[in-house]
């Protein structure tokens, strides 16, 4: 159990730091649409699509790697709670267009990139 806890702990810390860096690097470009949160969620959507295929098709991988990547790193990187407060802040300020745009970009972008990640990994690991 301890190796699983360490895998999640380290992965989550690294994912959260990357999310913070994305915010520092991108949020100032369009203050009404925090691009750091969007980038974190889109990158996480793509990466989890790849990870889902890899960890399903590669049964020999230690379970701690799945915990490190999906539960830890991608759990720390992606952020539904920050996304939610950004949407609600716009809505409560009467900025319904921005609230809708943020919501739609996160949801459609994440689903699209998750599918793209699954397609990418399936192409990489397809039997010859």
UniProtKB/Swiss-Prot annotation:
Na(+) is not transported, but it plays an essential structural role and its presence is essential for fluoride channel function. InterPro entries: FluC. It catalyses: fluoride(in) = fluoride(out). One of its GO terms (molecular function) is fluoride channel activity. It is found in: Cell inner membrane. The chain crosses the membrane at residues 5-25, 35-55, 67-87, 96-116. Belongs to the fluoride channel Fluc/FEX (TC 1.A.43) family. This is Fluoride-specific ion channel FluC. The lineage of its organism: Bacteria, Pseudomonadati, Pseudomonadota, Betaproteobacteria, Burkholderiales.
């Amino acid at each position: 159990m301890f190796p699983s806890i360490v895998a999640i702990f380290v992965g989550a810390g690294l994912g959260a730091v990357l999310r913070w860096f994305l915010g520092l690097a991108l949020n100032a470009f369009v203050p009404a649409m925090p691009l750091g949160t969007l980038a974190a969620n889109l990158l996480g959507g793509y990466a989890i699509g790849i990870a889902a295929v890899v960890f399903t098709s590669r049964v020999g991988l230690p379970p701690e790697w799945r915990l490190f990547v999906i539960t830890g790193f991608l759990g720390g990187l992606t952020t539904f709670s920050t996304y939610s407060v950004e949407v609600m802040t716009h809505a409560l300020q009467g900025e319904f267009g921005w609230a809708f745009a943020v919501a739609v970009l996160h949801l459609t972008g994440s689903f699209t990139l998750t599918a793209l990640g699954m397609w990418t990994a399936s192409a990489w690991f397809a039997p010859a």
